[in-house]
C-alpha cells in the first residue's frame, strides 16, 4: 500500500475549518450511520451531518485543495471526490481497526484521505 503524507492545508485554511467545525449548534450524528458491517462494530465517534451548510462549505474547501494539489494529482489522479466526512471523537470514543468499504453509497472509494486539523500530539490511535 502506498501512502502520501504532506501539508495540504495552510494555517489560515485550518483556522477557517476549525472555526466552522466548532460552531455550537452543529448536527453531529452517530458515526455508525455510515459504517459498513465490520466497521460498525468498532466505530464509536461522531460525524457532522453531511447535508448541513457547514459540512458542504468545509467539504468544498477541502475538495478544491485535493483536486488542485500537484502532489496528489501525480500520486493518485483523482477524477472526483465524494463522501467527504468530518468526524470527531469525544472522551472515551474511538474508531477501532477496520478496512473502509471499496463501494460506498456514492460510488467506488479507491482512495481514502485523512486530514488532521490539529498537531499529531493531540491525537491517540489511528496508527
Feature map (PLM): residue ranges:
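Non-heme Fe(II)/2-oxoglutarate
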Residues: 1-78, 83
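Catalytic core of non-heme Fe(II) oxygenases with the double-stranded beta-helix
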Residues: 70-127
Amino acid at each position: 500500500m502506498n501512502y502520501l503524507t504532506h501539508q495540504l492545508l495552510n494555517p489560515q485554511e485550518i483556522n477557517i475549518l476549525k472555526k466552522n467545525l466548532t460552531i455550537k449548534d452543529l448536527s453531529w450524528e452517530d458515526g455508525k450511520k455510515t459504517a459498513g458491517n465490520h466497521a460498525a462494530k468498532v466505530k464509536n465517534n461522531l460525524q457532522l451531518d453531511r447535508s448541513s451548510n457547514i459540512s458542504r462549505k468545509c467539504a468544498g474547501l477541502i475538495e478544491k485543495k485535493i483536486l488542485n494539489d500537484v502532489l496528489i494529482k501525480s500520486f493518485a489522479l483523482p477524477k472526483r471526490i465524494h463522501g467527504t466526512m468530518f468526524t470527531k471523537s469525544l472522551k472515551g470514543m474511538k474508531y477501532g481497526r477496520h478496512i473502509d468499504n471499496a463501494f460506498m453509497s456514492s460510488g467506488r472509494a479507491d482512495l481514502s484521505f485523512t486530514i488532521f486539523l490539529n498537531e499529531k500530539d493531540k491525537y491517540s490511535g489511528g496508527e
